[in-house]
Amino acid sequence: MRPIILQGHERPLTQIKYNHDGDLLFSCAKDKVINVWFSHNGERLGTYEGHTGAIWTCDINKSSTLMVSGAADNTMRLWDVKTGKQLYKWEFPTAVKRVEFNEDDTRILAVTEERMGYAGTVTVFRVPISESDAAAETPLYVITTRESKATVAGWSYLSKFLFTGHEDGSVSRYDAITGEFVESKQVHNSGSTITDLQFYPDRTYFITSCKDTTAKAIDVDSFEVIKTYLTDTPLNTSSFTPVQDFVILGGGQEARDVTTTAARQGKFEARFYHAILEEELGRVKGHFGPINTIAVHPKGTGYASGGEDGYVRVHFFDKNYFDFKYTL
């Protein structure tokens, strides 16, 4: 499984995303640009320039016509995927740490940082119809996270619920229509930050990764933890694979401690676990810093990882992966 290595950023990666068809890969980093690549050969298609701070997050709509991004310059921006033109800009008092389109691409959520006396929020907007659509600047609702600072968020199937992961290890559920708080649950160890939240393709359950070295699969309707994946290192990212019942986890020793460690001791591998049996199946090496973000190809043919080292590594699963059968 030889990867394609994409070198298009000068700073650590923050998030990578495939589009709905899987033919494009978008990468965000702390160097103020978003790159888009052909996922099958690693050719760079273009760059989205305009942000003036580290870019934390991006998302693409189903038709791959619009891309939304959030950054440390306290803005969320909407882009034309094809031309790279900035179509719309929303301004906030603090940095935008996570953005996501809902399932029918009519709304966007933005998670903002708790900073300088401002409370952390999850703000939901309508997707603008045109560049001159001034009404889209007004939020549909604003959730002020009462539990602790929200770090990640996402929409469930049919935009029924909105889930948030928090700095204290809890996960909260909100009514996605009204923004009303439904319930909160301490899923991870208290005081351990939830670093990622990704849904299974049908959005009926999702996986969280956490600094407490575990990842947990949670059912949308029952709000119960259905699976727990134990590792020996703080996790930054986790994702399900749509073909084969696996989860891929990424993390490693904290970036600030990395200079004192060999790559093997830093535990910078991507880890594959059996999604149902919770057993580790294997690891993929390559990055020489913590893995910050993992995205799985929508058709399950491969995955990409972005690291603190500034590289994106695109992997394609070989025949052995698809033939693999776990024996008890």
UniProtKB/Swiss-Prot annotation:
UniProt keywords, alphabetically: Cytoplasm, Initiation factor, Nucleus, Protein biosynthesis, Repeat, WD repeat
Superkingdom classification of source: Eukaryota
Gene Ontology cellular component list: cytoplasm; cytoplasmic stress granule; cytosol; eukaryotic 43S preinitiation complex; eukaryotic 48S preinitiation complex; eukaryotic translation initiation factor 3 complex; eukaryotic translation initiation factor 3 complex, eIF3e; eukaryotic translation initiation factor 3 complex, eIF3m
InterPro entries, alphabetized: eIF3i, WD40/YVTN_repeat-like_dom_sf, WD40_repeat_CS, WD40_repeat_dom_sf, WD40_rpt
Main location: cytoplasm
Compartments where found: Cytoplasm; Nucleus
Gene Ontology MF terms: RNA binding; translation initiation factor activity
One Pfam family it belongs to: EIF3I
WD repeat spans: 8-49, 50-89, 145-184, 189-228, 286-327
UniProt record similarity statement: Belongs to the eIF-3 subunit I family.
Protein name: Eukaryotic translation initiation factor 3 subunit I
UniProt source species: Schizosaccharomyces pombe (strain 972 / ATCC 24843) (Fission yeast)
